[in-house]
């Protein structure tokens, strides 16, 4: 049976609509607490489980934090509160403090009226599917509050930000610093606003922070990795060397160079792989997704690096990396994984890896990507009737086949259904924008006619 609440990145939705309601989140905390308390070795040791709760800057975070805390306490689980903290910061602190689990209250790059809950295991990794299934099973049981002498306690982790800042700095080579560099750092009015500027400043950079005035309602609003125009303008206006864009929970990274040019996760993955080759002699392989630009795949293979495409979602990139024992993977949206540095995607750490690569090479980003020109992509979202059988359409198959034949060796076609709405996403990639547009529109027209 499929999971009812957990998606690929925890539980997410609009605040006030099920399941992001205070009563459900309280029960979720209780259910998760009971699963933690019954973990192998926990009952035998008699030790009380302790979880860390962090959040981003959405106004609803206060309400959901209180609900989670109450649920965990009712299950007999102690709670440590980190306050506003990037998602990767919660993952790190959970592991570093030897806690039972970490919980993040965030909807990442979504607007303020959405929120979500995601969990990390004791080792700083996202929960396995079977543990999420156990939590869902407990949600169906009655909430039996622990006796007063068995209730969990809560306390604030006062030095959470400082601990995470030091961790981030430790991933930057000791032989380097950022003196003489002017950086614009866009924190998206999100979880990194008290952390990211300090990391780069303490490494010596002249930091110009933007997106650091959260009010509960402005997270990701015209700033951050989902709206990089603000950063591009700020870099040019301040004559900065580089701009760093994070999203609301700081697990994504986009970079802007001194000219205002934007670099996405695909391009940054190539830069990091090339840096590892220069440093270590070789990189066996890297992981992208179905959406990774074909030009990056071609360039990596030309460099002798195997390339594997995972399903869309950093969870699936991580699965492929672990399966193969590789270190580097990314999504074009800016989720970058470097498993020898962190167990999860970390925008700040990824930025430091890019800066270290530039320091080592003595090159600019444009120079490191010389010869790699991203293929134009055309994406068309076609709305269909719910349940429409697009896979059974001969007309759609013919349109796809015609495009693939025309683009053989110089482009690709990707058709996938949305998991949240009756929409078919048609993406065509080609060396020339006109070809991508032509074939995408032809396929989209076939879909519209076949599913009308």
Curated annotation (Swiss-Prot):
Coiled coil: none annotated. Catalyzes the conversion of glucosamine-6-phosphate to glucosamine-1-phosphate. It holds the Pfam family PGM_PMM_II. GO terms for cellular component: cytosol. Mg(2+) binds at residues 108, 247, 249, 251. Keywords: Isomerase, Magnesium, Metal-binding, Phosphoprotein. PROSITE patterns: PGM_PMM. GO terms for biological process: carbohydrate metabolic process; peptidoglycan biosynthetic process; UDP-N-acetylglucosamine biosynthetic process. Belongs to the phosphohexose mutase family. Activated by phosphorylation. The active site is at residue 108. It comes from the Bacteria. The modification Phosphoserine is found at residue 108. It catalyses: alpha-D-glucosamine 1-phosphate = D-glucosamine 6-phosphate. Its EC number is 5.4.2.10. This is Phosphoglucosamine mutase. Signal peptide: none annotated. Its cofactor is Mg(2+).
């Amino acid at each position: 049976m499929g999971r009812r609440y957990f998606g690929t990145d925890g539980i997410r939705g609009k605040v006030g609509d099920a399941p992001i309601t205070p009563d459900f989140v309280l029960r979720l905390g209780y259910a998760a607490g009971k699963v933690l308390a019954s973990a192998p070795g926990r009952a035998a040791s008699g030790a009380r489980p302790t979880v860390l709760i962090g959040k981003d800057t959405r106004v609803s975070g206060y309400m959901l934090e209180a609900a989670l805390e109450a649920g965990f306490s009712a299950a007999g689980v102690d709670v440590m509160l980190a306050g506003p903290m990037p998602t990767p910061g919660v993952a790190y602190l959970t592991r570093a403090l030897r806690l039972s689990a970490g919980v993040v209250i965030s909807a990442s790059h979504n607007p303020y009226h959405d929120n979500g809950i995601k969990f990390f295991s004791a080792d700083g990794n996202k929960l396995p599917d079977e543990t999420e299934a156990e939590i869902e099973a407990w949600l169906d049981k009655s909430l039996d509050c622990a006796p007063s002498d068995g209730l969990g306690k809560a306390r604030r982790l006062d030095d959470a930000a400082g601990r995470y800042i030091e961790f981030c700095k430790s991933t930057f080579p000791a032989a380097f610093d950022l003196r003489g560099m002017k950086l614009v750092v866009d924190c998206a009015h999100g979880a990194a606003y008290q952390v990211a500027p300090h990391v780069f400043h303490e490494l010596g950079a002249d930091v110009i922070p933007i997106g650091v005035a959260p009010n509960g309602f402005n997270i990701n609003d015209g700033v951050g990795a989902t709206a990089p125009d603000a950063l591009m303008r700020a870099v040019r206006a301040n004559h900065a060397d580089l701009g760093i864009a994070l999203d609301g929970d700081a697990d994504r990274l986009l970079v802007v160079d001194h000219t205002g040019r934007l670099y996405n996760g695909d391009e940054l993955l190539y830069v990091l792989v090339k840096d590892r080759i220069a440093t270590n002699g070789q990189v066996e392989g890297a992981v992208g997704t179905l959406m990774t630009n074909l030009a990056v795949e071609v360039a990596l293979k030309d460099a002798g690096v195997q390339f594997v495409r995972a399903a869309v979602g950093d969870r699936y990139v991580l699965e492929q990396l672990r399966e193969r024992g590789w270190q580097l993977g990314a999504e074009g949206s800016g989720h970058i994984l470097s498993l020898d540095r962190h167990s999860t995607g970390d925008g700040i750490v990824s930025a430091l890896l890019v800066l270290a690569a530039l320091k080592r090479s003595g090159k600019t980003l444009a120079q490191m990507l010389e010869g790699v020109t991203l293929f134009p992509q055309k994406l068309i979202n076609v709305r269909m009737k719910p349940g429409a059988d697009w896979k059974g359409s001969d007309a759609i198959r013919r349109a796809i086949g015609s495009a693939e034949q025309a683009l053989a060796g110089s482009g690709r076609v990707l058709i996938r259904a949305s998991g949240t709405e009756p929409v078919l996403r048609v993406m065509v990639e080609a060396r020339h924008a006109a070809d991508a547009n032509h074939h995408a529109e032809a396929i989209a027209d076939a879909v519209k006619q076949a599913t009308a």
